[in-house]
Amino acid sequence: YNLHDKLYLDPRLGMKYHYSDNVALKLNAGLYHQFLTTANNQDENLRLVELWLGIPEDKPASLAQHIITGVEYMSPGNIFYRLEVYHKDFDNLLTLKQDNPNTVEGDDPDSTVLNDFWDTDGNSWGIEFLLKKSSGRFNGWVGYTYAETEYYTEPSGWHHPNFDRTHTLNVVGNFDLTPDLEISTAVTKSSGNPYT
């Protein structure tokens, strides 16, 4: 892939400070460029195949700026807890223009259904909690995420993209029946998409 003849720097920073034997504070930040975009109709709620395209050469690469901070705690009972808060800014995203089945007379002759995009910016923020037990006959983890994502396009203004799910709960459990036999289960529960 070489549509872009430009060098992009993606610096990243990760720090962890051990406040005590059981408590650690974390900070992560970074820049992330992406050279792919989806070319799917945003009005489709059920999609079996995601169509990905390279960013057109006349568009800059998508940029995400991440910052994540959190605290970790290992209890005397060997149960791990983690709480994180994050914020992400998105620039130069692309959203496929809808209702453009083909070029029409008078339009740009190079415009097709798969290269006509709205310039899109966005942001995302959320809180994540993890509880994890790694030892003993019964072990597993519970994770909960509260997240919000918003995109801005010229025709729609600020809106929630169709993949935005506010609440997600994951539960994984393992039980050792014998030293050689383990049973496991996993359950995921999430709120629905913003549009139905």
Each language-model region and where it sits:
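Signature of Gram-negative outer-membrane beta-barrel scaffolds
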Residues: 1-24, 35-36, 40, 46, ...
